UniProtKB/Swiss-Prot annotation:
Name the record gives this protein: Gamma-glutamyl phosphate reductase
Source species: Prochlorococcus marinus (strain MIT 9515)
Function: Catalyzes the NADPH-dependent reduction of L-glutamate 5-phosphate into L-glutamate 5-semialdehyde and phosphate. The product spontaneously undergoes cyclization to form 1-pyrroline-5-carboxylate.
Subcellular location: Cytoplasm
Gene Ontology MF annotations: glutamate-5-semialdehyde dehydrogenase activity; NADP binding
C-alpha cells in the first residue's frame, strides 16, 4: 500500500490514461459554445437516468464508511441524498446557462497600422483534482471543466469509490452522445495513482486539491505542477456592540449549524464584551439544543459557556458541531484575533455601525469578508457561478470560490501584414499603441 508521503512514478497504465486525457482535452478545447452546452445537458440527463444506481452505490459506500468508523464530518460529506444529487444535476444545467468563458477578448490594441494585438481567454488544458469524501464534487468539477474546454483527471477519497465510479460512468454516457470525447473525464481509484498524478507534469496543467489540511499541504510541497487550493477553513464571525441581537443570533447559528462540515462554516465566534451577556443568554440554550459543544475563554465560561478553550482551539478547523467563543474588548481586538488566526477563507462581522463594518472589511485580508450575513454564502453556486471547482485562499487570483473564470487562462494573438521589428528600429514604421 502506498503511503500518503510517498510519491511514486506513474506506471504505464496511468501514462496511457493521461495521454488519452490530454488528447481528449485538445479536442474539447476546439469545440464551440453550443457543443459544450449540449454536452452538459446530456451529462445532466444521464445522471437523472442513472440516479438510482448512483444513490444505491452511495448507500454501499456509506455503510462501509460507518463500519470503518470514519469521522462524522467525513460521513456528512460522503452522504449523497436524492436532494443533493438533484442539486448537483441542477448545477450542471446552470453551468450550461453561464456565458461562454472562452474566446473573450480582454485586450485589443493596434500596435501599428495593420499590426493588431488581442488577448483572448483559452482553456487551461488538463485539470487534476484530488478531493476527499464529497461525491457531489465530481459533478461540479466535471461540468466546470467541460464548460471551460478542459479535460479533468479526478481522484476522490476511497470511501466514495462506488459513488464516484457510478457518477463518472453516467457522465461519460452523456458525453458519448455529444461531440466531446468521453476520455475528457478520467477517474482514478487508487491512492498510488493519485500520488503518481503529482508527477504528471507533461500531462496536467493545474492541480486542485480539495480535502484535509494535511493533504493540501502535502500536494503543494510535492509537485512541480501549479496548485490551486486552500489548506484550512478557519472562519470567524465577530459580533459588534452595535447589533441587532436577533440578526446576530440567526447569522451565528446558520454559520455554524447549517452544515458544520463545510469549510465555510465558522469555527470561532468573537463577541464584543458589552453585548456578550445578552447575546450568550439567548444563544447558549439554542446552541445546546442543536448539540453544539461550546468552548470559550475565561470570560465566556463565566457567562455560561461549558468548556474552557486553550490556544489550540483558536487555530483548529473542527468541521463539526464545536464552536470556540472569545469575548473581546472592542473591534480592534476582534480584528487582531482574526488577523492572527484566520486561514483567509471567509470572515464576517455583525453590526449596525457602517463605519465599523467598513473598517472590518477593509482590514481583514480574507478571500471573503461578509457583513450581516452567514459565512455559508461563500460558495460558487450561491455566488451565481453555477458551481465551483474549489476555493482558493491565496492572494493572487483566482481567489475565493473558483468557477469558470478560474479555469481559463489567456493567450496573446498578434496579426500583422509582414511587419518586422527592424522596420521600427530604422524608423520606417512607428508604434501607435491605440486601444480598439
Amino acid at each position: 500500500m502506498t503511503d500518503i508521503f510517498e510519491v511514486p512514478s506513474p506506471d504505464n497504465n496511468l501514462l496511457d490514461k493521461a495521454e488519452q486525457l490530454r488528447l481528449a482535452s485538445i479536442k474539447t478545447s476546439q469545440t464551440n459554445n453550443n457543443e459544450r452546452i449540449r454536452a452538459l445537458n446530456l451529462m445532466a440527463d444521464s445522471l437523472e437516468k442513472n440516479s438510482k444506481e448512483i444513490i444505491d452505490s452511495n448507500f454501499e459506500d456509506y455503510k462501509k464508511a460507518e463500519i470503518k468508523g470514519i469521522s462524522k464530518a467525513l460521513l456528512s460529506r460522503l452522504k449523497l441524498s436524492k436532494e443533493k444529487l438533484n442539486l448537483g444535476i441542477e448545477g450542471i444545467r446552470k453551468v450550461g446557462d453561464l456565458s461562454d468563458p472562452l474566446g473573450q477578448i480582454q485586450i485589443k490594441k493596434e500596435l501599428s497600422k495593420g499590426l493588431i494585438l488581442e488577448r483572448k481567454t483559452v482553456p487551461i488544458g488538463v485539470l487534476g483534482v484530488i478531493f476527499e469524501s464529497r461525491p457531489d464534487a465530481v459533478m461540479q468539477i466535471s461540468s466546470l471543466a467541460i464548460r471551460a474546454g478542459n479535460g479533468v483527471m479526478l481522484k476522490g477519497g476511497s470511501e466514495a469509490n462506488f459513488t464516484n465510479q457510478a457518477i463518472v460512468s453516467a457522465l461519460k454516457k452523456g458525453l458519448q452522445k455529444s461531440n466531446i470525447d468521453d476520455n475528457a473525464i478520467c477517474l482514478l481509484t487508487s491512492r498510488k495513482d493519485s500520488m503518481a498524478m503529482l508527477n504528471l507534469e507533461k500531462f496536467i496543467n493545474l492541480i486542485i486539491p480539495r480535502g484535509s489540511n494535511e493533504l493540501v499541504k502535502f500536494i503543494q510541497e510535492n509537485t512541480g505542477i501549479p496548485v490551486l487550493g486552500h489548506a484550512d477553513g478557519i472562519c470567524h464571525l465577530y459580533i459588534d456592540d452595535e447589533v441587532n441581537l436577533d440578526i446576530a443570533l440567526k447569522v451565528a447559528l446558520d454559520s455554524k449549524i447549517q452544515y458544520p462540515a463545510a469549510c465555510n462554516a465558522i469555527e470561532t465566534l468573537l463577541i464584543h464584551k458589552s453585548i456578550a451577556p445578552a447575546f450568550l443568554k439567548k444563544a447558549i440554550p439554542i446552541f445546546n439544543s442543536n448539540n453544539v459543544k461550546l468552548i470559550g475563554d475565561k470570560k465566556a465560561v463565566k457567562l455560561g459557556v461549558a468548556f474552557e478553550a486553550n490556544y489550540e482551539d483558536w487555530q483548529t478547523e473542527y468541521l463539526d458541531l464545536i464552536l470556540s467563543i472569545k469575548i473581546v474588548d472592542d473591534l480592534e481586538e476582534g480584528i487582531a484575533h482574526i488577523q492572527k488566526f484566520s486561514s483567509k477563507h471567509t470572515d464576517g462581522i455583525i453590526t449596525e455601525n457602517i463605519s465599523n463594518a467598513n473598517k472590518f472589511m477593509s482590514e481583514i485580508d480574507s478571500a471573503g469578508v461578509f457583513h450581516n450575513c452567514s459565512t455559508r454564502f461563500a460558495d460558487g453556486f450561491r455566488y451565481g457561478f453555477g458551481a465551483e471547482v474549489g476555493i482558493s485562499t491565496q492572494t493572487l487570483p483566482p481567489r475565493g470560490p473558483v468557477g469558470l473564470e478560474g479555469l481559463v487562462t489567456y493567450k496573446y494573438f498578434l496579426r500583422g501584414e509582414g511587419h518586422s521589428v527592424d522596420d521600427f528600429s530604422s524608423g520606417k514604421s512607428i508604434y501607435t499603441h491605440k486601444d480598439l
